[in-house]
């Protein structure tokens, strides 16, 4: 098996440099590129489990990219598979906390799926399941994460992880809180319910007060530990963090009919994103890992999410197209050149600015997601309207979704006893796994 694996890797990595012709001004060319890179992404899909072969949150992100593509092109080729996967992963309680993932689940993981469900609702996709609509699935995710708002440290905010025995429980981060903010903004607009605006404002005020979002220049930092009461902010910056807040402000700008407050925040985040996460040639990249070629399998998808959120911004605030679109066009041109690897000649790498736009020998689901999201963002002006219940959406709302299943997690600070048991269980499971591995080896 090891020899077979070696030869498979060798064959896959060998590039014939086929690439594909691409014209950012041609809808036909963009649609063709989307078909190519989506097919490459689906090479990682397992129909039996309805997941991609990656971390579970990336299945949610990948499915969202397919929903975005459906909205942009109207292509229904993969629509049945897309809906089936979104429904299959929702869990018994209709909250994207399935038993298979529950004890590894972070607020960001569950939230990514909530965004995917919200995207499905906004393009009028239906679950075909009477137990919950896509809107209800998004509301359940929102309500459960909101119920974990933790005032025992940092004056509020939600933690990265849900359970105290998971690494990262003592960390509050921008992506978890930014997703909560964006979901509130989207639900406000979709349902025409100002209660969600108030909740979005609550998350925004906390994020800016604690310093995750710096209103001086709209830098969005990764997060902080509760052990310092969030007084020591992590300086790392990731593209999806600024993107998730940007899209939230764009939805609120649109919902409030051009509020100058949300316009100011939207423009600040937009300008920060374009200035920091694009090269001088206007090519999107991840400055925290791409220059050192150290991006992990999660991080390769981050810039694709930023491209998605920039696309939403162009749809919701059309005057931003003149500013944003040239960056998306340059990035898409670079991506087309960089999607020239593998045995098929069209596998995508992640460093699109690298070596005159040739393949960088990297491949994976994240690379494909980023290419899909960047190509579809080119079609933001032609994409289907982001619907609401007042403009033709039919996905039913249930503000109480996720609050009555008896399984909502309420976070309380871990006691010494909790931490002790968590440490013991971690050791015990590790020891059993080690013994099992030794048994398999011999």
Swiss-Prot record:
Residues 20-421 are lumenal. The keyword Membrane applies. InterPro entries: 6-hairpin_glycosidase_sf, Glyco_hydro_76, Mannan-1_6-alpha_mannosidase. The keyword Cell wall biogenesis/degradation does not apply. The chain crosses the membrane at residues 422-442. It comes from the Eukaryota. Its main location: endoplasmic reticulum. It catalyses: Random hydrolysis of (1->6)-alpha-D-mannosidic linkages in unbranched (1->6)-mannans. It holds the Pfam family Glyco_hydro_76. Its EC number is 3.2.1.101. Coiled coil: none annotated. Keywords: Endoplasmic reticulum, Glycoprotein, Glycosidase, Hydrolase, Membrane, Signal, Transmembrane, Transmembrane helix. GO terms for biological process: carbohydrate catabolic process; fungal-type cell wall biogenesis; septum digestion after cytokinesis. Glycans are attached at residues 75, 124, 193, 229, 254, 257, 356. It is a single-pass type I membrane protein. SUPFAM superfamilies: Six-hairpin glycosidases. GO terms for cellular component: endoplasmic reticulum; endoplasmic reticulum membrane; external side of plasma membrane. It is found in: Endoplasmic reticulum membrane. Residues 1-19 form the signal peptide. One of its GO terms (molecular function) is mannan endo-1,6-alpha-mannosidase activity. Belongs to the glycosyl hydrolase 76 family. This is Putative mannan endo-1,6-alpha-mannosidase C1198.07c. It comes from Schizosaccharomyces pombe (strain 972 / ATCC 24843) (Fission yeast).
């Amino acid at each position: 098996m090891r020899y077979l694996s070696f030869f498979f890797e060798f064959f896959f990595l060998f590039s014939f440099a086929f690439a594909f012709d691409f014209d950012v001004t041609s809808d036909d060319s963009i649609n063709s590129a989307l078909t190519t890179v989506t097919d490459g992404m689906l090479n990682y899909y397992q129909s039996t489990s309805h997941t991609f072969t990656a971390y579970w949150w990336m299945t949610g992100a990948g499915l969202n990219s397919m929903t975005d593509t459906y909205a942009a092109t109207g292509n229904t080729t993969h629509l049945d598979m897309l809906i089936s996967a979104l429904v299959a992963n929702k869990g018994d309680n209709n909250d994207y906390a399935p038993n298979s993932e529950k004890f590894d689940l972070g607020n960001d993981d569950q939230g990514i799926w909530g965004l995917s469900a919200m995207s499905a609702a906004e393009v009028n996709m239906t679950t075909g399941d009477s137990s919950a609509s896509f809107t209800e699935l998004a509301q359940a995710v929102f309500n459960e994460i909101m119920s974990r708002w933790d005032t025992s440290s940092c004056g509020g905010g939600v933690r990265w992880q849900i359970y105290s025995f998971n690494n990262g429980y003592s960390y509050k981060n921008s992506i978890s809180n930014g997703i909560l903010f964006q979901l509130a903004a989207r639900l406000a607009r979709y349902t025409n319910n100002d209660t969600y605006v108030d909740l979005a404002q609550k998350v925004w005020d906390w994020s800016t007060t604690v310093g995750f979002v710096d209103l001086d220049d709209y830098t969005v930092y990764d997060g902080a530990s509760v052990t310092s009461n969030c007084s020591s902010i992590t300086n790392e910056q990731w593209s999806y963090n600024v993107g998730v807040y940007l899209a939230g402000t764009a939805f609120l700008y649109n919902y409030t009919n051009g509020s100058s407050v949300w316009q100011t925040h939207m423009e600040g985040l937009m300008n920060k994103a374009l200035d920091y996460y694009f090269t001088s040639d206007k090519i999107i990249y991840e400055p925290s890992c791409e220059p050192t070629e150290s991006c992990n399998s999660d991080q390769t998808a981050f810039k694709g999410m930023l491209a998605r959120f920039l696309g939403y911004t162009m749809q919701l605030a059309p005057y931003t197209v003149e500013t944003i679109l040239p960056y998306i066009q340059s990035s898409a041109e670079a991506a087309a050149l960089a999607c020239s690897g593998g045995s098929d000649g069209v596998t995508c790498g992640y460093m699109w600015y690298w070596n005159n736009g040739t393949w960088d020998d990297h491949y994976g689901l994240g690379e494909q997601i980023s290419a899909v999201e960047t190509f579809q963002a080119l079609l933001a002006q032609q994409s289907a309207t982001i619907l609401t219940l007042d403009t033709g959406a039919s996905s039913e709302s249930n503000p109480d979704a996720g609050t009555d299943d008896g399984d909502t997690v309420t976070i309380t600070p871990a006691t010494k006893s909790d931490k002790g048991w968590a440490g013991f269980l971690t050791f015990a499971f590790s020891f059993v796994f080690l013994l099992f591995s030794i048994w398999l080896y011999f």
